[in-house]
Regions:
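Catalytic cores of nuclease domains that cleave nucleic-acid phosphodiester backbones
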Residues: 1-49
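Intrinsically disordered, low-complexity coil segments
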Residues: 9-11, 36-54, 96, 118-130
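Classical nucleotidyltransferase
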Residues: 29, 40-69
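Metal-dependent nuclease catalytic regions and adjoining charged, substrate-binding loops involved
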Residues: 56, 66-164
Length: 164
């Protein structure tokens, strides 16, 4: 079961609410699944296997950096697993999980939050203004990417209307 933690960030004067997958007496870590792609074919379905990353994904480094602030006396690890591959990253085998790297990622996470805070202040409650401050990747809609697959066309039309 995930454990809930909060962390006050002075740089943005707010709390982060976090749920850490695994916490032991000396270590904490997160478990990531790496899924292949299921594709419909003329004969049914085809599943393409996906390898685990050779270095942690950037967003996961930001997450572990935050967790390291929540659990400063614990050593981090990050695992990825697919149906036929697995990898465990630790500070011993991964530069990204070392203390100095995690501090860099934490500062980057705070910067992202400051940017969002500024966008929200500039928008002043106007969703259309906020949308214009956040460049969309419209190519993902056109490609019917993962996040857009199966979304009602009316919702896509409404989303696009914020950019007109």
């Amino acid at each position: 079961a995930e454990l809930e933690y909060t962390h006050w960030a002075d740089g943005i004067k707010t709390y982060f609410l976090s749920y850490v997958d695994l916490v032991g007496s000396t270590n904490f870590g997160d478990i990531k699944n790496v899924f292949g792609t299921l594709t419909k074919t003329k004969k049914g379905f085809s599943y393409s296997k996906k390898k685990c990353p050779r270095v942690p994904y950037h967003s996961d480094c930001l997450q572990i950096a935050l967790y390291s602030k929540l659990l400063p006396k614990h050593k981090p690890f990050l695992t990825y697993a697919s149906n036929d591959d697995r990898v465990i990253f630790t500070p011993e085998n991964c530069v990204e999980l070392r203390t100095e790297s995690l501090q860099y990622y934490y500062e980057e996470l705070v910067l992202y939050q400051k940017c969002w805070e500024t966008k929200l202040e500039l928008a002043n409650g106007d969703a259309k203004v906020l949308a214009m401050l956040c460049k969309p990747d419209l190519s993902e809609i056109r490609k019917d990417g993962f996040w857009w697959k199966g979304i009602d066309p009316d919702i896509i039309k409404r989303f696009r209307s914020y950019y007109e």
